[in-house]
Swiss-Prot record:
Region (Disordered): 1-31
Spans within the Periplasmic topological domain: 98-133, 209-227, 285-298
Transport listed as a keyword: no
UniProt organism field: Escherichia coli (strain K12)
Name of this chain's protein: Inner membrane protein YhjD
Localization in the cell: Cell inner membrane
Coiled-coil region(s): none
Length: 337
């Protein structure tokens, strides 16, 4: 080997330190420390009263089949719309029977706007049937509506009680006689209808009064007041929702909930219900623009409304039932008396 080809190795000290081999134990310790930090932070967050309460309510809602009960309530709610439509059909028949000129105007509009003679004749026959059989349809619709309404109320009551009682299984005290159960559900249905009428009346009267005040004081042209009026209308609607849910959570559970939990849970339900109404208000018009939406949009929208209403009601019932207080014997570290 010649001198030129001989490998020359450096004899001076290197200016940098050689790369050390990666220590797997050090890497594992860093990962474990990061995981421990994340776990500790998550535990601290879960120990916060609001988050802990939300977790308890969610666990109870899921463990006690909240989604399944919500789907069942949706089904019975949609099924109960059929007798209501029958009653509405009969009411329209009574109105048309007492106003022959209005009936003739409807026939004229049908002939003007529908070019197909067969379809026009079918619609005229349907309207004539509604007028002629209004009494029969109305009585049958009322009877079926009463029966389905009582059963709907019973299903809603059982679903809320499943979320409200301390244990999942029904106790012997929960068993009621057949006629007592139906009488109780009938009274509850009447109470719910009264509460619904009161809340709708409050919303309607408040909205009309607001419009009268705006028109009387000539406030329409003041732009900065428009958001204020919207907020006032929103507050009135939430208050009406609050009255409705307060009656539901106060009347339907077997045992009366604590006042603080009832007030807060009802407020949560009122806000959630208002959010559902706002979302449905903006979603349905866009859904109805498509051909399929025009055909099925109203049905799907109604089912979605019932489903979200049922889930919200049951979740807030679970939220009220899982509320803990310092003097509550169910809290950790305390024993039942």
């Amino acid at each position: 080997m010649t001198q030129e080809n001989e490998i020359k190795r450096p004899i001076q000290d290197l200016e940098h330190e050689p790369i050390k081999p990666l220590d797997n134990s050090e890497k594992g310790s860093k990962v474990s420390q990061a995981l421990e930090t994340v776990t500790t932070t998550a535990e601290k967050v879960q120990r916060q009263p609001v988050i802990a309460h939300l977790i308890r309510a969610t666990e109870r809602f899921n463990d006690r089949l909240g989604n399944q009960f919500g789907a069942a309530i949706t089904y019975f709610s949609f099924l109960s719309m059929i007798p209501i439509l029958m009653v509405s059909f009969a009411a329209g028949g009574f109105v048309l029977a007492s106003h022959p000129m209005l009936l003739q105007d409807i026939f004229d509009k049908i002939l003007q706007n529908i070019s197909d003679p067969t379809l026009a004749a079918t619609l005229k026959n349907t309207i004539n049937t509604a007028v002629q059989q209004r009494t029969t349809v109305g009585l049958v619709g009322l009877a079926v509506a009463l029966y389905s309404g009582i059963n709907w109320m019973g299903n809603l009551r059982e679903a809320i009680r499943a979320q409200s009682r301390d244990v999942w299984e029904r106790s012997p005290q929960d068993q009621e006689k057949f006629w007592v159960k139906y009488l109780r559900d009938f009274i509850s249905l009447i109470g719910l209808l009264i509460a619904l009428i009161v809340t709708l009346s409050i919303t309607s009267v408040a909205g009309s009064a607001q419009q009268m005040i705006i028109s009387a004081l000539h406030l329409n042209s003041i732009e900065w007041l428009k958001p204020t009026w919207r907020l006032i209308g929103l507050a009135i609607s939430i208050f009406a929702n609050y009255l409705l849910f307060f009656w539901i959570f106060w009347r339907l559970p077997r045992h009366r909930p604590r006042k603080k939990a009832l007030i807060r849970g009802t407020f949560l339900a009122a806000i959630g219900f208002e959010v559902i109404k706002i979302v449905m208000t903006y979603t349905l018009p866009s859904l109805m623009k498509s051909p399929s939406g025009a055909a099925f949009g109203s049905v799907l929208g109604l089912m979605a409304f019932f489903y979200f209403f049922a889930r919200l009601t049951l979740f807030c019932a679970a939220w009220i039932a899982t509320a803990e207080y310092k003097d509550d014997p169910r809290m950790p570290g305390k024993t039942q008396p």
